[in-house]
């Protein structure tokens, strides 16, 4: 089977890898000059199944209103001039209830736990190195109210069989020794010892090299001008005057997936949620984190790579705007400087932004479409790195007719059809004869 994958981020490359392992002839099309140069380039570095939860949660509407008036708020909304932004926010708010949260979190954790296992399997099989660590995640709680508010999350972790440790400030310092100097600022912590970390860009680049060894072709610097169809099947992908044909097609273009498939009559509810990161050179290893922490107050993650600290966070709804907002840098600098003041040269840090493809319910969209030979792998939000291997393997199984190793219930576009979403009629774009 010949498959064309649109998108060379961590999801596209992971999908290509598993398809190639299944015996498919795979071509990856990417507009940048290499893999993982957009959203997969500078993320927070966390592989955190236990923290796989939708942003659409009970209490978020009220918190969102409060955050609007805070300087270092984790969420910001800037009107992008589109009706779609308002519609997407409305759908997200509709998921901010206990019932929807439980269903969505269950789906996300199922996929995330599986994906972590697949990454471990991949590491054992190939020896892939990407500055990975298996030291767990430590969620830092700065107030007693946050400690008490962990009860619901702990109940979910227990129900899902996720290992965890509840810590006091001294316990936090034992897990992350550099926090000893600032433990007076903490009320407690929640550790998930089975979480992992790593450089997503490095992982994707090296996995792409392994994929090439299995015959995957990568074409960089190409722009997909359109997807041709006959109303029932995809007949080719148009790149300038060239029409590329395959037996199956996968769209894994992150936040840009929606525009690519909209002309086909597929309206996927994915919105670009802007995130930021700093990459700080380490100057004092003893003053840096050993694994990764998540500051619950500011929703900022601080992760240790070999000689760097990655500080990532924020959620800004402002469309496809990729401008670097200096106020977001101030927030990231403030958080890492508050917790790890002696770990690295913060002023020498590089500043980055990327667009996470988010669905209103938090669950990604993985699976087929109304076209028999077109599949989607997008909408992972802040968890693309956490869910990449599992998502790639699940979709490869679906495409090749193998039985997925986990339940795929609720992962495809079908869940929106069940909610009464309307889909527009596809525009039929027949292939040019002789192309």
Swiss-Prot record:
Cofactor: FAD
Key word Oxidoreductase present: yes
InterPro entries found in the cross-reference section: DadA, FAD-dep_OxRdtase, FAD/NAD-bd_sf
GO biological process: D-alanine catabolic process
EC number assigned by the record: 1.4.99.-
Pfam families named in the record: DAO
Binding annotation for FAD: 3-17
Pathway: Amino-acid degradation; D-alanine degradation; NH(3) and pyruvate from D-alanine: step 1/1
GO molecular function (one): D-amino-acid dehydrogenase activity
Keywords: FAD, Flavoprotein, Oxidoreductase
Top EC class, one word: oxidoreductase
UniProt entry tagged with the keyword Flavoprotein: yes
Catalysis: reaction(s): a D-alpha-amino acid + A + H2O = a 2-oxocarboxylate + AH2 + NH4(+)
Span of the signal peptide: none
GO cellular component: cytoplasm; plasma membrane
Function: Oxidative deamination of D-amino acids.
Family membership noted in the UniProt record: Belongs to the DadA oxidoreductase family.
Protein name as annotated: D-amino acid dehydrogenase
Organism: Chromobacterium violaceum (strain ATCC 12472 / DSM 30191 / JCM 1249 / CCUG 213 / NBRC 12614 / NCIMB 9131 / NCTC 9757 / MK)
């Amino acid at each position: 089977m010949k498959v064309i994958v649109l998108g060379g981020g961590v999801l596209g490359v992971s999908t290509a890898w598993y398809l190639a392992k299944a015996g498919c002839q795979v071509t990856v099309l990417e507009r940048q000059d290499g893999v993982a140069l957009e959203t997969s380039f500078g993320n927070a570095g966390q592989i955190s199944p236990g923290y796989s939860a939708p942003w659409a949660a009970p209490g978020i509407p009220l918190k969102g209103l409060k955050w609007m008036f805070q300087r270092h708020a984790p969420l910001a909304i800037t009107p992008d001039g589109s009706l779609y932004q308002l519609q997407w926010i409305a759908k997200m708010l509709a998921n901010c209830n206990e019932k929807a949260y439980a269903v969505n979190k269950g789906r996300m954790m199922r996929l995330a736990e599986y994906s972590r296992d697949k990454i471990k399997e991949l590491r054992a099989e190939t020896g892939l190195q990407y500055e990975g660590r298996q030291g767990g995640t430590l969620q830092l709680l700065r107030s007693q109210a946050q400690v008490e508010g962990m009860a619901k999350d702990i109940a979910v972790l227990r129900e899902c069989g996720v290992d965890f440790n509840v810590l006091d400030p001294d316990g936090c310092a034992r897990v992350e020794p550099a926090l000893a100097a600032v433990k007076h600022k903490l009320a407690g912590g929640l550790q998930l010892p089975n979480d992992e970390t790593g450089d997503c860009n490095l992982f994707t680049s090296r996995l792409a090299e392994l994929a090439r060894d299995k015959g995957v072709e990568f074409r960089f610097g190409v722009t997909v001008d359109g997807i041709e169809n006959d109303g029932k099947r995809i007949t080719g992908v148009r790149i300038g005057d060239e029409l590329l044909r395959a037996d199956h097609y996968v769209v894994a273009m992150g936040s840009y997936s929606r525009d690519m498939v909209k002309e086909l009559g597929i309206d996927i509810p994915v919105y670009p949620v802007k995130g930021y990161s700093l990459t700080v050179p380490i100057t004092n290893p003893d003053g840096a984190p050993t694994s990764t922490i998540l500051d619950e107050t500011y929703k900022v993650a601080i992760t240790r790579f070999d000689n760097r600290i990655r500080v990532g966070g924020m959620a800004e709804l402002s469309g496809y705007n990729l401008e670097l907002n200096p106020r977001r840098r101030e927030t990231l600098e403030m958080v890492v400087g508050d917790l790890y003041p002696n770990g690295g040269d913060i002023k020498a840090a590089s500043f980055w932004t990327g667009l996470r493809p988010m669905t209103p319910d938090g669950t990604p969209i993985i699976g087929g479409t109304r076209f028999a030979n077109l599949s989607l792998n997008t909408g992972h939000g802040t968890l693309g790195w956490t869910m990449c291997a599992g998502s790639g393997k699940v979709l490869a199984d679906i495409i090749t007719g193998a039985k997925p190793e986990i339940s795929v219930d609720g992962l495809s576009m079908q869940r929106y059809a069940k909610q009464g979403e309307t889909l527009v009629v596809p525009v039929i774009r027949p292939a040019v004869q002789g192309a």
